[in-house]
From Swiss-Prot:
Subunit architecture: NDH-1 is composed of 14 different subunits. Subunits NuoA, H, J, K, L, M, N constitute the membrane sector of the complex.
A Gene Ontology BP annotation from the UniProt entry: ATP synthesis coupled electron transport
Name under which the protein is recorded: NADH-quinone oxidoreductase subunit K 1
Annotated HAMAP family: NDH1_NuoK (MF_01456)
Function: NDH-1 shuttles electrons from NADH, via FMN and iron-sulfur (Fe-S) centers, to quinones in the respiratory chain. The immediate electron acceptor for the enzyme in this species is believed to be ubiquinone. Couples the redox reaction to proton translocation (for every two electrons transferred, four hydrogen ions are translocated across the cytoplasmic membrane), and thus conserves the redox energy in a proton gradient.
Organism: Solibacter usitatus (strain Ellin6076)
Record field: catalytic activity: a quinone + NADH + 5 H(+)(in) = a quinol + NAD(+) + 4 H(+)(out)
Assigned protein family: Belongs to the complex I subunit 4L family.
Transmembrane segments: 7-27, 31-51, 63-83
């Protein structure tokens, strides 16, 4: 019978995913890439919540992850609508070119 995967592996994966999300958020100039980086950070935090919830044999982490996913889905819908509107008005997705709300 196989042994279970250690908790530290999940937390390490979560830290790596979060670091990649932060790097993408800080160093990329495309709005879509920045948006995906934010979602990656949210999913890394969700992985940590589920890992700690599993370790402590409680359901709270799973429930909190569910609520984070619901909020992230709503944020994705609104965020993508805003991104589409910005692209329609400016014809670019570069953050440096979209620096104000004025036309």
């Amino acid at each position: 019978m196989m042994n279970a995967v250690p908790i530290s592996w999940f937390l390490t994966l979560s830290a790596i995913l979060f670091a990649l999300g932060v790097a993408g958020f800080l160093f990329r100039r495309n709005i879509i890439t920045v948006f995906m980086s934010i979602e990656l950070m949210l999913n890394a935090v969700n992985l940590s919540f589920v890992t700690f919830s599993y370790q402590h044999k409680e359901v709270a982490g799973h429930l909190f992850t569910f609520f984070v996913m619901v909020v992230a889905a709503a944020e994705a819908a609104v965020g993508l609508a805003i991104i589409l509107t910005v692209f329609k008005n400016r014809s670019t997705l570069n953050i440096d070119d979209v620096n104000s709300m004025k036309n």
